[in-house]
Amino acid sequence: MSKVIGIDLGTTNSAVAVLEGKEPKIITNPEGNRTTPSVVAFKDGEIQIGEVAKRQAITNPNTIVSIKRHMGEADYKVKVGDKEYTPQEISAFILQYIKKFSEDYLGEKVTDAVITVPAYFNDAQRQATKDAGKIAGLNVQRIINEPTASALAFGLNKDQDEKVLVYDLGGGTFDVSVLQLGDGVFQVLSTNGDTHLGGDDFDNRIMDWLIKNFKDENGVDLSKDKMAMQRLKDAAEKAKKDLSGVSSTHISLPFISAGEAGPLHLEADLTRAKFDELTSDLVEKTKVPFDNALKDAGLTVNDIDKVILNGGSTRIPAVQKAVKEWAGKEPDHSINPDEAVALGAAIQGGVISGDVKDIVLLDVTPLSLGIETMGGVFTKLIDRNTTIPTSKSQIFSTAADNQPAVDIHVLQGERPMAADDKTLGRFELTDIPPAPRGVPQIQVTFDIDKNGIVNVSAKDMGTGKEQKITIKSSSGLSDEEIKRMQKDAEEHAEEDKKRKEEVDLRNEVDQLIFTTDKTLKDTKDKLSDSDRKPVEDALEALKKAQKDNNLDEMKEKKDALSKAAQDLAVKLYQQNGGAQGAAGQAGPQGGNNGGAQDGEFHKVDPNK
């Protein structure tokens, strides 16, 4: 089996790792960074992803951030020009980019992946994540919970039995999971969380504070200015990160707006104490899931051997202080909170490929599952924190005499009334023979696979007739839609490849024209007109093709000039005994070497 990569598809940043030997290793992106911003931008018909998309976000309104917050939302679409994209498609662009640079690193095709999700993601959100992987051309071997993945990274090669609490505060989601580790078994005992709480919310508090102060001082509301808001967002994120290391930071945004008297500048000093005051309720909001996870596991803080912090937002000092107080012990800092999830996903990939032995992962379903019964009551069949995969059946009956069909309304949640819980899907079991109310026996079976994806069936025990559905999530992508999106993604990949080849060709042509012109100028007195003419003619032909913007002609004339220049270099070498000619040879041949030489030339900083 080929390598199975592990992907942490994050709200703010994503990361990817692979098992090398027996150890997981982070794969760096083309910029050399170990995490990639989960940002997608559309500009001039081109799709930009990661660092480059984030850098131009201020000036480009068609930039999408934090799309993970909308995974599984049926009606959410991103409009770009006259086209609409689902959260799955935007996420697929990120996954496709990760897939590509992983393939470049490994030197082989990547088809299989383990993708992580917040432990508290519901079925719709999990299915949407799996669909995103499929659109990106990945066979998603497993969806695993982020805290579980970080526990895998922490617990690899550790033999002792431990109860571990994972506090996972990312860019947009929050989870707490309690696990039992021992003898290679990673068993999740409980999980709790909030899928709409994370580092973005901390950034927003700083932004709100800056907007209010600026309005009080200048009478201008920056929240109405899209470009100003993007600058504020970047500044708030930077200030938050700065305050993890220093007690005060200065925020400076010149020319943020304009008033009657001219340009307006934003200058502010934010102390860590003020930041803690602005965000204290957000930190406190994580206490309830913390307590509930312990309660559901049947444990107290005294039973916990280790506390692991996961997610970049756990670098916030107030968060670390709170967790230490609640847990009664110092959290473990042995693994990088930005990388642990991807590393754990890579380990699970190794388990799937057979490269890692003696590890068993026992995860749980985060929310209860059941159906709506008479009176709008939510009747649970599978309780939250049940180890998966699992299956559960229960017998129900009709609510009226001679009822010909039953509507199976599948739900997920913890509220007693169906209207307050999350609808996963509906289906109907028909052709029930006439019978008094309560006589027909309808067996409803819930089956949850290892990815947490739900299958539900209903069977009339009298006739043997059965109806079943795989919950495709309320985001509702059909196989046809996924195939169409896959095709779109592949076309974009082909377009990107063509665009890259075109840029490389133009760079090679520019370089070859420059070096050939220089060679002809430097050897003006050493060559006869008859020797120079083939090169001059080929050079003019290439310049014309470049001016006409004819790519086919440019390629043909580039090859012709390269050959003519090489012939000229040989003559120079013969005339001058080698040394001087060799210098002339280097230029024209440089243009014939493809992208590597050109890349090196273009990276030189003329100011250094």
UniProtKB/Swiss-Prot annotation:
UniProt similarity note: Belongs to the heat shock protein 70 family.
Signal peptide: none
InterPro entries on file: ATPase_NBD (IPR043129), Chaperone_DnaK (IPR012725), Heat_shock_70_CS (IPR018181), HSP70_C_sf (IPR029048), HSP70_peptide-bd_sf (IPR029047), Hsp_70_fam (IPR013126)
GO molecular function, one term: unfolded protein binding
Task performed by this protein: Acts as a chaperone.
Biased amino acid composition, Low complexity: 577-586
UniProt keyword annotations, A-Z: ATP-binding, Chaperone, Nucleotide-binding, Phosphoprotein, Stress response
Inducing or repressing factors: By stress conditions e.g. heat shock.
Residues with the Phosphothreonine modification: 173
Biased composition (Gly residues): 587-597
Annotated region (Disordered), positions in chain: 577-608
Name of the protein in question: Chaperone protein DnaK
Species classification: Bacteria, Bacillati, Bacillota, Bacilli, Lactobacillales
Domain of life: Bacteria
One Pfam assignment: HSP70
Biased amino acid composition, Basic and acidic residues: 599-608
